[in-house]
């Protein structure tokens, strides 16, 4: 596992203890293999960051996503890499922005299955603030677009595009968005729909 228990304790001391959510999804064989391929060296995590700017959230679109399907940027921490260094590296690669983490919001414990196969996955979710840079992906092989999205878009057109894609992984991201945006509204970090 790339992220040690000690690293998580340090992150929780600095950014707070997250709410833990358990989810389960049955995947197609194709999607399951794609997740399996991402598990080199035992990786079983991603860090997702909701970068908030002017009551909007930074979202990204990957080349294989259908038009209109966006999600919060995310990435993996490399073996031996400091947690915060990995997050800032991923944020810069995917969005062109320099960020600082604000709060550790959620730890999603997800069980992806395909027949008898099981992948236990953890998504660490943070709120973040842009501190510099320009909103434009640096790693253009992995990310084709980065932009700001309103709460209305996240709950409306973007959510619909993620679900309509038929991808279990994108359905998971739609549900993750719903849960995180609700918490950000409840904490006053985002204004509710139609109030921005």
Segments (PLM) and residue ranges:
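Short connector loops at helix/strand junctions that flank enzyme active sites
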Residues: 42-46, 52, 65-67, 72, ...
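Conserved Nudix-box catalytic region and its N-terminal flanking loop in Nudix hydrolases
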Residues: 52-93
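Unchanged
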Residues: 77-100, 109-164
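Conserved beta-strand residues within beta-sheet cores
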Residues: 46-48, 98-101
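Short, solvent-exposed loop/turn segments at secondary-structure junctions
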Residues: 41, 67-68, 108-113
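Acidic, metal-coordinating catalytic segment for phosphate/diphosphate chemistry
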Residues: 2-48
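Nudix hydrolase/Nudix homology domain
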Residues: 1-3, 141-196
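Residue-level detector of beta-propeller blades
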Residues: 104-106
């Amino acid at each position: 596992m790339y992220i040690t228990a000690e690293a998580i304790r340090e992150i929780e001391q600095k950014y707070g203890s997250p709410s833990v959510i358990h989810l389960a999804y049955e995947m197609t064989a194709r999607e399951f293999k794609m997740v399996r391929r991402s598990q080199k060296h035992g990786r079983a995590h991603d860090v997702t960051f909701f970068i908030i700017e002017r009551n909007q959230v930074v979202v990204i679109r990957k080349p294989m996503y259908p038009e209109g399907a966006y999600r919060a940027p995310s990435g993996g921490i490399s073996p031996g890499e400091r947690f915060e260094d990995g997050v800032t590296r991923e944020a810069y690669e995917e969005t062109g922005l320099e960020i600082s983490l604000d709060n550790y919001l959620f730890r999603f414990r997800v069980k992806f299955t395909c027949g008898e196969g099981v992948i236990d996955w953890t998504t660490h979710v943070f709120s973040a603030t842009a501190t510099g840079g320009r909103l434009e992906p640096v790693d253009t092989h992995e990310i084709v677009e980065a932009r700001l999205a309103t709460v209305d878009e996240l709950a409306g057109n973007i959510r619909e595009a993620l679900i309509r894609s038929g991808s279990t992984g994108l359905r998971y991201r739609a549900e993750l968005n719903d849960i995180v945006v609700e918490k950000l509204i409840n904490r006053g970090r985002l204004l509710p729909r139609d109030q921005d």
